[in-house]
Swiss-Prot record:
It comes from Ureaplasma parvum serovar 3 (strain ATCC 700970). The keyword ATP-binding applies. GO terms for biological process: gluconeogenesis; glycolytic process. This is Phosphoglycerate kinase. Monomer. The keyword Iron-sulfur does not apply. ATP binds at residues 222, 309, 340, 370-373. GO terms for molecular function: ADP binding; ATP binding; phosphoglycerate kinase activity. It comes from the Bacteria.
Length: 422
């Protein structure tokens, strides 16, 4: 059972059935050398894939990879899911029969390939986002904008549709919302159920003190989630790029940092309503550009004139670590500094992750629910010390805000009589 009251894979008889399986295989790829750099999303999908293999299913995989913006993106093969085939073949259950790839994802050839599948075969269809660009190079948005025709085609390819693509579960795409609508039967895979169950621990039944750490860049993307967390957590600490709009709203000089001026009133409203619960980071490691040179330390009271704030300062970090070590539930969403290839400004996020890992060993419940910080924690080797690391940032924020995921609306519901019994 899950709080969305949607059927899960174990509610259906998948034995010997043809399963259309929607996954988020948007892995990190070195496109120049055609190498997968981070396969965490693929690994997270394995429990569902292996369950289907071990139940003799015929599996048809839908997924996207990268952002397809032009005809050149499509024709170059740069974002082709073919790069996934060997990696998947090497990682799935040894009971698999064949793993094959289709350079198409629509049409009679695809139908024939599906019909030719044997038990324990896997067929990976080409990148679903290829459907967003026509052969003439026009944007048609069939996948992104949720084409019913495309969803009907994919939904009718199998006996059952299983959605396990958590990373896009908040978006109504053809490959989730429309495909489920036209499928004979549908359910959620293990990954999505696991993601929801872990978020529910932090949202519905958290141990107190409950600390929420919110970093990242855009206030507009996170303001609703911040308000929800202010209602539920004992303390919310705001850092990362979005902190500068909050500071600007309070009258501070934030230098060269981005300020979302259209969000100033929202920031002030949050601070006025929840001021006793919110801490805004108050000192920073700065520079006048984004080079990995020696940081310039500034307290916000001194102003950041001519500077970018690239990481939190030692005093903010000391306070955050103190709060982590006294908390029993800790949720982190978003890095607190620039962590992409700039070592001098990753220290704040690194120390936060290390402190969370240490507090996990003391019995706290810890969750990281954004892609960038999750990847950083894994890079540090700390992922095994955090209770749960999510595979989706936007989906987690949407679930925190609304308690639902729009892309999953059309998945079959658990019958009311079953809900009453439980």
């Amino acid at each position: 059972m899950n709080s969305l009251n949607k059927k899960s894979i174990k509610d259906l008889d998948v034995n010997g059935k043809t399963i259309v399986l929607h996954l988020d295989l948007n892995v990190v790829v070195d496109y120049e050398n055609k190498r997968i750099l981070n396969d965490r999303k693929l690994r997270a999908s394995l429990p569902t894939i292996n369950y289907l293999i071990n139940h003799n299913a015929k599996i048809v995989i839908l997924s996207h990879l990268g952002r397809i913006k032009t005809l050149a993106d499509k024709q170059s093969g740069k974002y082709s899911l073919e790069i996934i085939v060997d990696e998947l073949r090497n990682r799935v259950s040894k009971n698999v029969n064949r793993v094959v790839f289709s350079p198409l994802n629509y049409g009679e050839t695809v139908v024939q390939m599906v019909n030719d599948l044997e038990e324990r075969d896997i067929l990976i269809l080409e990148n679903t986002r290829y459907c967003d660009i026509s052969d003439e190079g026009e944007y048609v948005g069939l996948e992104w904008d949720g084409s019913e025709i495309l969803g009907q085609f994919w939904g009718m390819l199998g006996d059952i549709f299983i959605d396990d693509a958590y990373g896009v579960a908040h978006r109504q795409l053809s490959s989730n919302y429309q495909t489920a609508k036209f499928a004979k039967k549908s359910a959620l895979g293990f990954l999505i159920v696991n993601e929801i169950n872990h978020l529910d621990i932090a949202l519905e039944v958290p141990k107190s003190p409950y600390l929420a750490l919110i970093g990242g860049n855009r206030v507009a993307d996170k303001i609703a989630a911040i308000e929800v967390l202010c209602e539920r957590a004992d303390q919310v600490i705001i850092g990362g790029g979005l902190v500068y709009t909050f500071l600007y709203a309070q009258g501070y000089n934030v230098g060269l940092n981005l300020v979302e001026r259209n969000m100033i009133d929202d920031c002030n409203n949050i601070l006025e309503k929840y001021g006793k619960k919110i801490l805004i980071c108050f000192d920073f490691l700065c520079n006048n550009d984004f080079s990995d040179t020696r940081p310039i330390y500034r307290k916000i009271d001194e102003g950041l004139e001519g500077l970018y704030g690239l990481d939190i300062g030692k005093r903010s970090l000391k306070f955050i670590k103190h709060e982590i070590y006294r908390s029993k539930t800790i949720l982190l969403n978003g890095p607190f500094g620039v962590i992409e290839n700039i070592k001098n400004y990753a220290q704040g996020t690194t120390e936060i992750c290390k402190s969370m890992a240490k507090q996990t060993t003391r019995g706290a419940y810890t969750i990281i629910c954004d892609i960038d910080t999750s990847s950083h924690a894994e890079y540090l080797g700390l992922d095994k010390y955090i209770n749960f690391i999510s595979t989706g940032g936007g989906a987690s924020l949407s679930y925190i805000e609304e308690g639902v995921l729009d892309g999953l609306e059309t998945i079959d519901n658990v019958p009311l009589n079953v809900l009453k019994k439980e």
